[in-house]
């Protein structure tokens, strides 16, 4: 029985093992079948975050990534059922079916007596009607899209394995041709549509693109024309050709961004305008700037074309165009637009990648637009990068043009000036990018701050997050702040215009740390020092309030950077008069008004500059109409209306230049020997008729008559227009000289008007700050005039009149300041008089108290003579006069009087009576009159006084300390009534 049981038990165990193995095999098979979907053999892999799913075009994480090693398709785990059949497996199945079909056909031909051609087609292929019913109409097939292609397995899946092989082959060939035809038509339609859009886009520059299709100028012109020029000219023209060609390509890139991408996103995809603006910031402004510049370059090329040729040209002058492009309003507009575009470059690329990853329609649009070969290298990312890099190409091109320019010195000077302007523009763009990035960072920090976060500033009030937006962010970073307990706190330090701000992150929001030291440190007189024994630590020593902060950086280089930027900010820190630490609402309102005034001044200066330019054009046009053809346009003095710069002309210098121009114009019109007798107070002089009956307003030194309109002199000078100087250069004609001086005079007078307007605004803005500030301002404004007078020649009468007017203006300002000082002195005198009156009242009260004290002493002496009191009696030390306890003593009243201290910055008040001397005299007098306590006790031992007091009130000494304490607690009114009774009895 034991053997049977053991065999049975072994059989049962073996059956269990076989069952478990079978279950494991089934599970493995199910897992394998689960991965084997539509011919794909998927395996799990680990991918990066930027890998896209082939089915849904979304990013794949590491946990749900599957890959088919046969066709190299990477998809989500959830997208494997939506994927089409594996292409490699499909090709293998088609090959196997084709080979099997061929072998079957061969076997059939061997068994049959007739050939395949002789047999009916129905023996191998189905009938046409059956084929038509299976395949469906062509109209239904044409509706199939490229994305949803039909597979052979789906169509032939209704037939069993016994179906004819020819039928399956026909179905496979028909569906493959259908998919291929639809795919070809779709791609061709997309390419045609994109090419049509691009051709319409570049229709404006079609001829120009043909002219600049060659790689260089040497290949664009004729060979015979090329051989006529030297090697340096060829190199120069090659660089100029490259400048125009690259500018044309840049304009094409901007047109693609505006008309192709942006218009399509707005009209076809219906994206939000804010999203599209984030992708292409400032493209309209950039397109206008470079289109205008390209038009000027192409016009210069057309002017340089050789007669009878459309290809051969040599451009000799280009510096004037470059100067006009990279200076003035054009340079300011370029600086502003490129700064904004480049600062938002990274955000635009990030936004584009997000849209491309999550929006399938956006992907299809980008693929459709970039189908043509021309646009394959001009995607959205490539266009943004090309626009960013364009401004850096100008210095290289201009320097190469300057390197190969020899012969025309004026052209070299213009090119040198243009190169300097371009480099200055690049530095301004870099600074603008830095400021915009820091502004965006400051706005980000402001948005993350707790709205209720405030920190107290000693003597200033609470410092809130609104104060951050008033300032500019210079540098920021995370540091370690060592507290008084020796612990380190992670803080975000903001280096701003005039302060250092410490912030701490709490619950994903920034707050001011609540530590033992203020969180806002002023940069005024701030000292920064590195810690000697540590590579990452530094001390920040503040003057107001006196505190020392110990902070640590992440590395030694970071510490050096922090020390450098803090020291630079301390040197450029504004004063508290110009930039208060905490601004109230009234101060903010006044600051906004001042800013508006400055904007109005700038607008006025710009209008005056345009007015002077229009006047120059008008005078030039009138001179050409009068017969002065070929006359050059008068030039305006550069920098005339740049009143905000340090090198700007002051009002006095402008006035002197205007007077000098008037003198030159007078010498040109009436001759150097004529003195103008007209004065500002005499508008005109009577004209004296000469012998011929003509009037002559002026007479020369030798008595020769001249006219003021200059017709005689100018006509005479026109006949001698071929005059030359000592170097043989052609001199300007008197008419051109008069025109130039007239334009200069007009511009100088309007520049003087602009300078006076700005100076008045500045003076009114600085008026509440006191006379010292205004005196410094007036001194700074007149510094240029004083420097000009120091090295000037003897002053002319007109200049003396000008100086007299300026002195009168200054005298009026001084008189106004004197009246203000007098009013202030009167106010202070009134205040001193009130203080003297209060002092006299206190002296009178003191004298009254002294008289009362003297009377009380006499009464006490009289009482002491009547009835002496024992010296050890406690009530003998009671004050003599009860009223003295209810009234303030003279010295206490005097010491309690605190006169108001003079305010800071004002003069001290010299009072006629010295407090210390009066107090000292009063103490000496009281000491002499009252004497020592022993003398007072001796004086009080008068038997008469004691008898009177005994007869009136019959007081007895206390029998215990409790009675003595109770006697001391007698109210003041009772004591005063007793004192009055005693006084009445006495």
Curated annotation (Swiss-Prot):
<dbReference type="GO" id="GO:0045087">
    <property type="term" value="P:innate immune response"/>
</dbReference>
<keyword id="KW-0493">Microtubule</keyword>
<dbReference type="GO" id="GO:2001224">
    <property type="term" value="P:positive regulation of neuron migration"/>
</dbReference>
<feature type="region of interest" description="Disordered">
    <location>
        <begin position="862"/>
        <end position="986"/>
    </location>
</feature>
<keyword id="KW-0391">Immunity</keyword>
<feature type="modified residue" description="Phosphoserine">
    <location>
        <position position="952"/>
    </location>
</feature>
<dbReference type="Pfam" id="PF17838">
    <property type="entry name" value="PH_16"/>
</dbReference>
<feature type="modified residue" description="Phosphoserine">
    <location>
        <position position="953"/>
    </location>
</feature>
<dbReference type="GO" id="GO:0005794">
    <property type="term" value="C:Golgi apparatus"/>
</dbReference>
<dbReference type="GO" id="GO:0005819">
    <property type="term" value="C:spindle"/>
</dbReference>
<feature type="modified residue" description="Phosphoserine">
    <location>
        <position position="133"/>
    </location>
</feature>
<keyword id="KW-0524">Neurogenesis</keyword>
<keyword id="KW-0963">Cytoplasm</keyword>
<dbReference type="GO" id="GO:0060546">
    <property type="term" value="P:negative regulation of necroptotic process"/>
</dbReference>
<keyword id="KW-0344">Guanine-nucleotide releasing factor</keyword>
<feature type="modified residue" description="Phosphoserine">
    <location>
        <position position="122"/>
    </location>
</feature>
<feature type="modified residue" description="Phosphothreonine">
    <location>
        <position position="945"/>
    </location>
</feature>
<dbReference type="InterPro" id="IPR037806">
    <property type="entry name" value="ARHGEF2_PH"/>
</dbReference>
<keyword id="KW-0399">Innate immunity</keyword>
<feature type="compositionally biased region" description="Acidic residues">
    <location>
        <begin position="941"/>
        <end position="950"/>
    </location>
</feature>
<feature type="modified residue" description="Phosphoserine">
    <location>
        <position position="711"/>
    </location>
</feature>
<comment type="function">
    <text>Activates Rho-GTPases by promoting the exchange of GDP for GTP. May be involved in epithelial barrier permeability, cell motility and polarization, dendritic spine morphology, antigen presentation, leukemic cell differentiation, cell cycle regulation, innate immune response, and cancer. Binds Rac-GTPases, but does not seem to promote nucleotide exchange activity toward Rac-GTPases, which was uniquely reported in PubMed:9857026. May stimulate instead the cortical activity of Rac. Inactive toward CDC42, TC10, or Ras-GTPases.</text>
</comment>
<dbReference type="GO" id="GO:0005923">
    <property type="term" value="C:bicellular tight junction"/>
</dbReference>
<dbReference type="GO" id="GO:0042127">
    <property type="term" value="P:regulation of cell population proliferation"/>
</dbReference>
<feature type="modified residue" description="Phosphoserine">
    <location>
        <position position="109"/>
    </location>
</feature>
<feature type="modified residue" description="Phosphotyrosine">
    <location>
        <position position="894"/>
    </location>
</feature>
<keyword id="KW-0131">Cell cycle</keyword>
<feature type="modified residue" description="Phosphoserine">
    <location>
        <position position="172"/>
    </location>
</feature>
<dbReference type="GO" id="GO:0005085">
    <property type="term" value="F:guanyl-nucleotide exchange factor activity"/>
</dbReference>
<dbReference type="GO" id="GO:0071474">
    <property type="term" value="P:cellular hyperosmotic response"/>
</dbReference>
<feature type="modified residue" description="Phosphoserine">
    <location>
        <position position="940"/>
    </location>
</feature>
<dbReference type="GO" id="GO:0045666">
    <property type="term" value="P:positive regulation of neuron differentiation"/>
</dbReference>
<dbReference type="GO" id="GO:0005737">
    <property type="term" value="C:cytoplasm"/>
</dbReference>
<feature type="modified residue" description="Phosphoserine">
    <location>
        <position position="956"/>
    </location>
</feature>
<dbReference type="InterPro" id="IPR000219">
    <property type="entry name" value="DH_dom"/>
</dbReference>
<feature type="modified residue" description="Phosphoserine">
    <location>
        <position position="177"/>
    </location>
</feature>
<feature type="modified residue" description="Phosphothreonine; by MAPK1 or MAPK3">
    <location>
        <position position="679"/>
    </location>
</feature>
<feature type="modified residue" description="Phosphoserine">
    <location>
        <position position="947"/>
    </location>
</feature>
<feature type="modified residue" description="Phosphoserine">
    <location>
        <position position="691"/>
    </location>
</feature>
<dbReference type="InterPro" id="IPR046349">
    <property type="entry name" value="C1-like_sf"/>
</dbReference>
<feature type="modified residue" description="Phosphoserine">
    <location>
        <position position="645"/>
    </location>
</feature>
<feature type="modified residue" description="Phosphoserine">
    <location>
        <position position="163"/>
    </location>
</feature>
């Amino acid at each position: 029985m034991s053997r049977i049981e053991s065999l049975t038990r072994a059989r049962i165990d073996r059956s269990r093992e076989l069952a478990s193995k079978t279950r494991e095999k089934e599970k493995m098979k199910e897992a394998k079948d689960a991965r084997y979907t539509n011919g794909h053999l998927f395996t799990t892999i680990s991918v990066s975050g930027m890998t896209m799913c082939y089915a849904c075009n979304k990013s794949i994480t590491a946990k749900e990534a599957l890959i088919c090693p046969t066709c190299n398709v990477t998809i989500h785990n959830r997208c494997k059922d939506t994927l089409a059949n594996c292409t490699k497996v499909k090709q293998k199945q088609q090959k196997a079916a084709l080979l099997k079909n061929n072998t079957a056909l061969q076997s059939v031909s061997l068994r049959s007596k007739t050939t395949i051609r002789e047999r009916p087609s129905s023996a191998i292929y189905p009938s046409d009607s059956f084929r038509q019913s299976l395949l469906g109409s062509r109209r239904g097939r044409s509706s199939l899209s490229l994305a949803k292609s039909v597979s052979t397995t789906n169509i032939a899946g209704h037939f069993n394995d016994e179906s004819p092989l020819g039928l399956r082959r026909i179905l496979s060939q028909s569906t493959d041709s259908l998919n291929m035809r639809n795919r070809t038509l779709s791609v061709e339609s997309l390419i045609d549509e994109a090419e049509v859009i691009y051709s319409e886009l570049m229709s404006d520059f079609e001829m120009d693109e043909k002219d600049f299709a060659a790689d260089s100028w040497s290949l664009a012109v004729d060979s015979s024309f090329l051989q006529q020029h030297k090697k340096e000219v060829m190199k120069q023209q090659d660089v100029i050709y490259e400048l125009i060609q690259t500018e044309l390509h840049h304009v094409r890139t901007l047109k693609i961004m505006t008309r192709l991408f942006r218009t399509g996103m707005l009209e076809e995809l219906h994206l939000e305008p804010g999203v599209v603006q984030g992708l292409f910031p400032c493209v309209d402004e950039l397109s206008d700037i470079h289109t205008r510049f390209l038009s000027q370059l192409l016009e210069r090329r057309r002017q340089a074309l050789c007669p009878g040729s459309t290809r051969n040209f040599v451009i000799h002058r280009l510096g004037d165009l470059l100067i006009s492009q990279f200076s003035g309003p054009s340079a300011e507009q370029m600086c502003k637009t490129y700064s904004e575009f480049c600062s938002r470059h990274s955000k635009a690329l990030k936004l584009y990648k997000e849209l491309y990853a999550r929006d399938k329609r956006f992907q299809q649009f980008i693929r459709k637009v970039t189908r043509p070969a021309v646009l394959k290298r001009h995607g959205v990312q490539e266009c943004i990068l090309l626009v960013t890099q364009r401004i850096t190409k100008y210095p290289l091109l201009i320097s190469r043009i300057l390197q190969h320019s020899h012969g025309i010195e004026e052209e070299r000077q213009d090119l040198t000036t243009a190169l300097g302007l371009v480099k200055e523009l690049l530095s301004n763009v870099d600074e603008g990018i830095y400021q915009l990035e820091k502004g965006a960072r400051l706005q980000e920090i402001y948005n993350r701050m707790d709205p209720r976060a405030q920190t107290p500033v000693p003597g200033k009030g609470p410092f809130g997050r609104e104060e951050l937006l008033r300032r500019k962010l210079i540098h920021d970073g995370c540091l370690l702040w060592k507290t008084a307990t020796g612990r380190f706190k992670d803080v975000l330090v903001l280096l701003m215009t005039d302060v250092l701000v410490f912030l701490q992150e709490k619950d994903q929001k920034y707050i001011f740390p609540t530590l033992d030291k203020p969180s806002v440190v002023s940069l005024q007189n701030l000292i920064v020092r590195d810690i000697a024994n540590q590579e990452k630590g530094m001390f920040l020593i503040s003057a107001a309030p006196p505190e020392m902060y110990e902070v640590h950086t992440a590395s030694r280089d970071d510490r050096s950077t922090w020390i450098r930027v803090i020291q630079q900010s301390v040197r450029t820190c504004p004063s508290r008069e110009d930039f208060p630490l905490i601004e109230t609402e009234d101060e903010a309102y006044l600051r906004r008004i001042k800013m508006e005034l400055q904007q109005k001044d700038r607008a006025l200066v710009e209008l005056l500059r345009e007015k002077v330019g229009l006047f120059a054009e008008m005078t030039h046009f009138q001179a050409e109409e009068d017969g002065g053809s070929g006359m050059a346009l008068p030039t305006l003095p550069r920098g005339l209306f740049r009143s905000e710069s340090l090198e700007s002309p002051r009002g006095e210098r402008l006035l002197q230049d205007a007077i000098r121009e008037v003198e030159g114009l007078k010498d040109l019109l009436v001759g150097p020997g004529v003195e103008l007798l007209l004065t500002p107070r005499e508008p005109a002089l009577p004209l004296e008729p000469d012998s011929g009956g003509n009037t002559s307003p002026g007479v020369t030194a030798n008595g020769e008559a001249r006219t003021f309109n200059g017709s005689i002199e100018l006509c005479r000078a026109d006949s001698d227009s071929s005059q030359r100087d000592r170097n043989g250069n052609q001199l300007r004609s008197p008419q051109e000289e008069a025109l130039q001086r007239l334009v200069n005079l007009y511009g100088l007078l309007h520049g003087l008007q602009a300078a006076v307007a700005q100076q008045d605004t500045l003076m009114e803005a600085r008026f509440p700050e006191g006379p010292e500030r205004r005196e410094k301002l007036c001194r700074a404004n007149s510094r240029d005039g004083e420097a000009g007078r120091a090295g000037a020649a003897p002053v002319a009468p007109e200049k003396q009149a000008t100086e007299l007017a300026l002195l009168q203006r200054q005298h009026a300002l001084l008189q106004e300041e004197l009246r203000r000082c007098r009013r202030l002195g009167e106010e202070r005198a009134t205040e001193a008089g009130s203080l003297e009156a209060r002092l006299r009242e206190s002296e009178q009260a003191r004298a009254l108290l002294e008289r009362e004290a003297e009377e009380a002493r006499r009464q006490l002496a009289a009482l002491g003579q009547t009835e002496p009191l024992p010296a050890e009696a406690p009530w003998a030390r009671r004050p003599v006069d009860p009223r003295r306890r209810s009234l303030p003593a003279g010295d206490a009243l005097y010491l309690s009087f605190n006169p108001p201290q003079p305010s800071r910055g004002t003069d001290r008040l010299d009072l006629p009576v010295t407090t210390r001397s009066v107090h000292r005299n009063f103490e000496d007098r009281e000491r002499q009159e009252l004497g020592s306590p022993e003398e007072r006790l001796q004086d009080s031992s008068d038997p008469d006084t004691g008898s009177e007091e005994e007869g009136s009130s019959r007081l007895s000494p206390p029998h215990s300390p409790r009675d003595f304490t109770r006697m001391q607690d007698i109210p003041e009114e009772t004591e005063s009534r007793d004192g009055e009774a005693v006084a009445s009895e006495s």
